[in-house]
Structures are given as C-alpha cells and as structure tokens.
Amino acid sequence: MQIPLQISFRNMDPSPAVEERIRKKAAKLERFHDRIIGCTVVVEAPHRHHHKGKLYSVRVDISVPGKDVVVDRAKPSDQAHEDVYVAIRDAFDAAARRLEDEARKMRGNVKSRASP
C-alpha cells in the first residue's frame, strides 16, 4: 500500500487487539490486488440508546488505480455481528471478493455474456 492504513472507531474506544486484527486482514488484501493505493477502515458500535444488542458495522474503503472499492457492512442480517471480530471478518471477506473482481476486470479476464 502506498498510503498507510487508516483505522477509526466511532461510538467506541479504540482497541489495540481490534486494530491488530484489522492490520492483518488489510495486509492480506494485497494478495487479491497488487496495486492497492490506500485503505481506510471504520468500525462503528451502535449508539448507546439501542437496546437489542450491539451490532457492529465495519466499512472498508480501498483505493485502487481508477476506482474506489467500498464495502459497508452496516446492516447485518443476523446477530453474528454482535462480535466485532466477526463483523471485521465479514467486511474483509467481501472486500477481498470485490478486489478479485476488480483485478480480473483490469486483466481482461471477465467472462462476457454472448448476445442472443
């Protein structure tokens, strides 16, 4: 990455353990796309007035030449995102898939549909 990883926390205190997990996941993204310019990660806990569990949201913004890849896991469909590490894993898994798709497009290895 050309620009250092940026990590921010909203509605929660920063955690060195969470930051370390994010750094490891972000480092692995370079396997999927070798031209990553920068990456910003925002981990957000719900406002304190919510009463039904804490569902964390994780947003990953990745800059590659000519495009920004944004993955936002803000509204999880299940209760698994009560664990911040699961929310991080899901966001980075989705980011890896998107980066693979972008890398394929850049190489021209995208399957095209035959016209009828």
Q: Could you tell me what each predicted segment is?
A:
Residues M1-P116:
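N-terminal, polar/charged subdomain of small-to-medium soluble alpha/beta proteins
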